[in-house]
Amino acid sequence: CLLLNTISSCSMMAQSIGSAISGSTYPSDDLELVAVEADYAAKEAALQAEIDNIEISHPGYDEYRYDLDMIGHDPHELAAYLSAVLQGYTRQSAQAELERVFDAQYQLTLTEEVEVRYRTETRTDSEGNSYTVEVPYNYYILNVKLTSKPISSVASELLTPEQLEMYQVYRQTLGNKPLIFGGGSTNTSDSESLEGVE
């Protein structure tokens, strides 16, 4: 009887652990996760290209002033956000939410400014004497400002309390797929090997 109770308890504990692991794993297929990440990175690349080409797309200014935040994101923050909102998602089903996140993360503002400046010109009077005058002219400036915030800030603004809780679980576990977006290592233990060190 004791053996049956022990087996039953172990079985329930295994089910509980299995539920906890599956509840903290990204519910989407790996290929979809990677494809959606690539789509978001492409949006960021397009934004960078737009900024890089401002002087071509908006010609005619005397000066361009840039105040730019960084462009970039943590792929696991994006996957955690989308998983919390959409649960299992595909490349197609995630597009509207990708746009929503992108619009909340990045704000590009172009503002025209006109300064009246003065230049010194030399003129000659009717008697042949030279004199200088300050002549006003318009100096055109295009202010280019990009503000950005991390997806973690976007998440706290846009998610419901329940979604935010799921987002935080996915962030802590990296969806149980820490290497899906490349880089890093699953080994978090201290390294003691001095192999190759002379």
What are these regions (language model features)?
Residues C1-V197:
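Membrane-proximal envelope biogenesis segments
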